[in-house]
Structure formats: C-alpha cells, structure tokens
Amino acid sequence: MDLAYMAELPQEEFTERRQKVFAQMQPNSALLLFSEIEKRRNNDCDFPFRQDSYFWYLTGFNEPNAALLLIKTEDAEKTVVFLRPRDPLLETWNGRRLGVERAPQKLNVDEAYSIDYFKTEFPKLTEKLTALYHASDRHPWGDKLIAESAVKFYAVFDWQPMLSEMRLIKSPNEIRLMQQAGQITAFGHIKAMQVTRPNRFEYEIESEILHEFNRHGARFPSYNSIIAGGDNACILHYTENDQPLKDGDLVLIDAGCEFAMYAGDITRTFPVNGKFTQPQREIYELVLKAQKRAIELLLPGNSIKLANDEVIRIKTQGLVDLGILKGDVDKLIEEKAYRQFYMHGLGHWLGLDVHDVGRYDDDRSRTLEVGMIITVEPGIYISEEADVPAQY
C-alpha cells in the first residue's frame, strides 16, 4: 500500500457532512458542538491534545476551545465557528493558532468569532430560533458558556444519535485513511513478532510497536497498547506491560495506531520463542477457524449476531473436541458454558474512535450496510486457574 496516498480528508468532505446535518435539522433551529479542551497531566504540563471526534467530524479543525454553530431558518443556512484569537505571545509558547480572520476561508464557514465573545454573540445569532441541538454534559466548559449566555429554547435535542449514525457509514475517503491506519498497525505487529524473544519485557515490545507507528506518520496509538505475556493475556484490558516474557508462553498483543484521526485495532497472539506447542497450536487454530468464518459472514444484509452465533458454535464444538468442555454442544451453548473462555463480543465499530459510535440494536442484530467498519476479534482465554486438561 502507498502510505503517501492520503494524509487527510479534503475540506469539501467536512462541508458535505455539515450539509447532511442541515438536511436533518428542523427549521428555526441551531446545532451547537464544542471542541475538546487541553487537559492537565500534572503541574504545568498538559496531555497531548486530541480533538473531540464529533467536532472533528464536522470541522476538521484541530484546536481546543472552539465551537461550531449551525443555524437553519425557514429560508437560509449559516455555519459559524468560535475559536481562539491570534495571540503572538501565547503562540510563541504554545503553538500557532488559526485565528478569527483566517477561519472562514480555511474552514469554509460563513462567519467566525472569538470564543471570548461567545456569551454575547450566541444570543444574537439564535434570538429568533426555537430549537437547539446540543449534547449536554459532554463538555462542561461549553455547558457553562451556554448557561452564561442566558439563551432559552422551546426545545432541546441531543445531536449525538444523529451524528453517530452519520459517522457509522464511512465515505470512500475515510475507508482509504482507515486502510492506511490498518496497514501501519500491521507494520507494528509484524515488528513485534520479529523482535519478541524470551526474557524481553512487555514494555520493550510496546516500544518497538510505537516506534514503527511513528516511523509511518502515526504519532500516537489509538488506545493503550496491551502486551500481555502468559496469564496476563487473560486480563482483557491489561496495560501494565511491565513483566518479562517467558520461554514457552504465548504473548497477546492488542495495539493500534491513530492515523489522520482514524483508529487501527489489531489483536494477535503468538509464541514468545517462535514455536507453538501442540496444545497452543490447537487453541490458536480453533480461534483462527472461528475468525475466518466470521469474516465470511460479515457482509451487507447479515448481522454481527449472525456471525457471533456461528463463532460460538465453532468454538463450543472445538472445545468439546479438545476435552475442555464436556456435554452436548447445543446444551452447552444454551447454558453459555463458553463464556468462561470467550467472555466478550465478536467485534465493534471502528472509526474516529476505536470503539466507534453507532447503534448495534439488541444482541447486535442490526443489519450490516456498505460503509460500516467492524473489528473481528474472537478469542479463547484459558487462565492458569481454569479447570481444564493440564496441557492447556
């Protein structure tokens, strides 16, 4: 894959998304989104800034302390941004700002104001409107600005369901970026396989993965990396990554890069010393069989539930064949006996967030559509304390 093919979305795509939002808003209403703000790590040091995914989805703007306001009347639509003004002193210390003057052209919006004037301009812009789309409690700093502006609306709607459904269906450009995120993530996993050996620490492998991400233009992981040797792999969200890898153990790696704001997510398990034991191979091949079958079934018109039900049957039958479970397969499935070894779902939506937004419906029975992106990660977890044949 040519990793230089695309590094960001064209501004026209953000404009098109806003037009789709306007089409779903009722007349005489406004939709308001706030950006993320900088967050303190410890005294005088902030965490690296990461934009709110919804705000990014409609703006492509990567600065804190900003707001997007969409205004729809009976006969017109207007897009307004509030953002930090230029400040030469603060920009010398903390980095460049787009500024109010350049924002309309750069972001393709109608008007721009300093965020410092939100409390005075927001009432003027919305004084004749009756409804507001706003996700309260998502950003307390924004809720405070709204309260201080003293604007009252006849109706308030949560925009999250609407925007979540939009985000669920990826455009061709988004898919290309996510393919790149997936490829870079795969490079990291391949590097990990190449450098893993007994007595190396989990964090050493993590550092190799992160370095590979960085080499290909992905500065940050999309979530905290899991490098879990031996029994640590039975802790689903293990992130200590501070133990030595032991000869004869397996190591589970769950890691993904974030590229152009989009998440990669890959989980792989392999032997620390490079060679499976026979029992390890049997479990590995059972999981692989289930994964391949799930991928065959995850097609438009089917559902995650359909694929997961098949995965459960394959695993349960396989565990019976290996003597790990005992009894009738149908009865074991009905009793959920597999849950002690497979305690999570088959996968999740993937996009701007690693656990991306969008409805699943009951039991993940939602019909799959073109443009949805889902992870496929069945697993079998057998802890040291599990009551199973000794070889496992």
Regions found by a protein language model. Give the residues of each.
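Active-site neighborhoods and metal-handling regions in enzymes and metal-associated proteins
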Residues: 1-392
